[in-house]
Amino acid sequence: MAKITKEDALRYHEGKRPGKIEVVPTKPYFTQNDLSLAYSPGVAEPCLEIQKNPQDAYRYTDKGNLVAVISNGTAVLGLGNIGALSGKPVMEGKGLLFKIYAGIDVFDIEVDESNPDKFVEAVKAIAPTFGGINLEDIKAPECFEIERRLKEELDIPVMHDDQHGTAIISAAGMLNALEVNGKDISTIKVVVNGAGAAAISCARLYVALGVKKENIVMLDSKGVINTKRERLTPEKIEFATTRDDIHTLEEAIVGADLFLGLSKGNILTKEMVRSMASDPIVFALANPVPEISYEDAMESRPDVLISTGRSDYPNQINNVIGFPYIFRGALDTAATAINEEMKLAAVRAIADLAKQPVPEIVNEVYHVNNLTFGREYFIPKPVDPRLLTEVSAAVARAAIESGVARKSIDDWDRYKEHLREFMGRESKLTQQIHDTARSHPKRVVFAEGAHPSMMKAAVQAKEEGICHPILLGNDERIAKLAKELDLSLEGIEVVNLRHDREASRRERYARILNDKRQREGYTFEEANDKMFERNYFGMMMVETGDADAFITGLYTKYSNTIKVAKEVIGLQDGFDHFATMHILNSKKGTYFVADTLINRSPDTKTLVDIARLSEKALHFFNHEPVMAMVSYSNFGSDKGGSAGDVHEAIEILHREHPNWLIDGEMQVNVALNRELRDSKYPFSRLYGKDVNTLIFPCLSAANSSYKMLQALSPDTEIFGPIQMGLNKPIHFIDFESSVQDILNVTAIAVIDAITNEKK
């Protein structure tokens, strides 16, 4: 995991716009009529309806999708009591997670009040605004009383995630670990090291699932909590043991079946793990340093089943697996509470998910052939897209069956489909691409190594574990620029292609290229001269296996790069062209656009190749291709010019690929409006389908369209260009590409190299 510096963190949070969240209108506001509907006088009508029936607030406002993340800053992460305002970045971050994982809107509320009674009154006063309340970073024991009172006195879901999030995920892990080792939950002995909010909640949930309370031993900073201890809180009394023969962790853990650590790092020794029962379960959840490291636990004995809070080891216990989806299910049923039935439903849904076949996208992110249920995998991965549908639906169903729901769901398949549609960016594509690249980083050559943006991207890619960068350029210039930018080039290879020390490599590359192209008018001397050019040299590094991928474009015209790529790398078998694609991640969904850079005025055969390459690319990104070939006419209404070429291309594709979901030619608005298309052109192969791929009739149309959207809709994430059709991973960037753009293309190049390696 890349080290995060103070400067990185502050720069990220400040940025061009401080903070991590914003409020975005969801209704039109462009005309005076729009504004009259949004505010006075039109706004009076929903106000009056809500006055008559308060439940209509869920119908006419965002209440049903709005959660308050509320804190008083008394127990912020590992920072302690830093105050309400100081904790605001954490609350904004929690809001970000709610949004990206479950599409839930969040207002972070920082209440500068440590008195529980006054805090409760403040929260109650603002509660009508929200559909749910997530309590965050409130110290124990006050957090227990605050949550209890708010749950009793409010009619919306309230959950203190610090307590219940860890409990729910670890409980799911416990059930599955017990299935792996074959032990009976009613007989296991549990040691809980820590007695804070999360520890108490975990113990309570374990008991609800079948652990006997008398089989639990809990420890705090003073040792074993037993009935002889004085001045215990009510929560500690609840789990005080009657045993007086044990006082320390070392004594308590002998013969234990499960260790749950919610305390501090490096407190559990190898010897203690060896003293546990057979096939012990160890949940070492202290952060950032667990009670025992994964390596030490595995060295202590081979039969241990271990989970930590860290993402770089198997079976991570991460609250993000739970809270977004628990609130999603609660909000979608307008539940009055998050009760025990809903929490238990979440536990079982999460546990069950780990036993199901894993989506290929998850395997790719973690670079395994096939994750299967067992010792190395008994808790679902946070990137699993099924969490949204399965956990949310389980919680919603439990809300309905337990009687706390005010809205019913009749069609559960449609509900799950709605969740995917509602999220828009259902695949969290960018995150998954970067995670996949990190799982198996490759050697990537950056052509313009002395360009500030490319150097920054290369350094960031190395720090994030995306690739092993190789910078092409003059050593001295690169070193000087790195110093000016205060960047460390440690671990980054610099290749000065024009230096004498590279003479033998230039000659070797020239001979290989000459042998490949000598029947096309090449001479060795010409080939050798070309090796002084960064694109020829860099692509030959990939061609010969000295590198795995190549990125270029900041200084070079595409026409030249295209020519070099065809000469050095060549096209994939079965294709006469190559092309590029951009990915558009919008609130409406993820769209793929081609060809955005390569083919200026494609004829019919070229359009067919672009469609074939696009279909292949969609499968590469784990999307079902639903492709529209667009033009200025609809289904033959005008067969002149480029529309005629598109029309002919569709005829060929329909004939050669009768099962593909592709049609055209059609206008862009028809392609993107399913209802309009279905009503006007019910004969289309795309009937009832939402298009996710647009293939344009010419380069100017595709390029202008995505760049216009980039300028007019900054909240749309644009990813690319992505090369399709070359034999090896050669990828291009725009001359105005940002560091993030280059980083994204780098991740794509790495995945391309991983795929190329498997061929």
Where are these regions (language model features)?
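Rossmann-like adenosine-cofactor binding region
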Residues: 237-305, 310-312
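A short, aliphatic-rich alpha-helical micro-motif
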Residues: 127, 185, 252-253, 273-276, ...
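N-terminal ligand-binding/catalytic initiation module
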Residues: 1-158, 353, 392, 397-398, ...
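Adenosine-phosphate binding glycine-rich loop
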Residues: 2-3, 161-162, 181-183, 284-392, ...
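Anion-binding alpha/beta catalytic cores of soluble intermediary-metabolism enzymes, centered on
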Residues: 85, 137-184, 406-409, 415-759
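NAD(P)-binding Rossmann-fold cofactor-contacting core
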Residues: 193, 209-236
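Glycine-rich adenosine-cofactor-binding loop
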Residues: 66-78, 83, 167-171, 181-207
